[in-house]
Amino acid sequence: MGARKKISAEKRKEALKTMYFAKLQNVPTSPRKMRLVADMIRGMEVNRALGVLKFSSKEAAARVEKLLRSAIANWEQKNERKAESGELFVTKIFVDGGATLKRMRPAPQGRGYRIRKRSNHVTLFVDSKSNNEDQN
């Protein structure tokens, strides 16, 4: 690794220490379906987001709800106190494509159609309102 790349990697690593996030990797849901759920809660207060996810009929909502609870726990662990109602917000959430498993499905006349079983990675950031205003 080059010197400049190493320096920038260390800066990025230091910046992540001040952020509160949780990652969910290799989720066996297509990224397109997961993004629908991610768009529902982006920018919301965490208690409201948990309520929205709890009553959502999407399968991906249960996974994102568990991830959000993990991010809240990470925030509480780093700050050594409980999160109060209305204090934390979902600042960023993004869904990236993961590994794609390729499978064959029998098709007419001896052919095979390819099926792509997609997976994704979800990264969710939470922060308090006062920290958001300081950064902007």
From Swiss-Prot:
Alphabetical list of CDD domains matching this protein: Ribosomal_L22
GO molecular function ontology, one term from the record: structural constituent of ribosome
GO biological process: translation
Cellular component terms (Gene Ontology): cytosolic large ribosomal subunit
Transmembrane annotation, as ranges: none
Family matches, as InterPro entries: Ribosomal_uL22 (IPR001063), Ribosomal_uL22_bac/chlpt-type (IPR005727), Ribosomal_uL22_bac/org-type (IPR047867), Ribosomal_uL22_sf (IPR036394)
Gene3D superfamilies (alphabetical): Ribosomal protein L22/L17 (3.90.470.10)
SUPFAM superfamilies in the record: Ribosomal protein L22
Family matches, as Pfam families: Ribosomal_L22 (PF00237)
Signal sequence residues: none
Keywords of this entry: Ribonucleoprotein, Ribosomal protein, RNA-binding, rRNA-binding
HAMAP family hit by this protein: Ribosomal_uL22_B
Quaternary structure, from the entry: Part of the 50S ribosomal subunit.
Functional summary from the UniProt entry: This protein binds specifically to 23S rRNA; its binding is stimulated by other ribosomal proteins, e.g. L4, L17, and L20. It is important during the early stages of 50S assembly. It makes multiple contacts with different domains of the 23S rRNA in the assembled 50S subunit and ribosome. The globular domain of the protein is located near the polypeptide exit tunnel on the outside of the subunit, while an extended beta-hairpin is found that lines the wall of the exit tunnel in the center of the 70S ribosome.
PANTHER family for this protein: CHLOROPLAST 50S RIBOSOMAL PROTEIN L22-RELATED, LARGE RIBOSOMAL SUBUNIT PROTEIN UL22M
NCBIfam families per the UniProt record, alphabetical: rplV_bact (TIGR01044)
Family: Belongs to the universal ribosomal protein uL22 family.
UniProt name for this protein: Large ribosomal subunit protein uL22
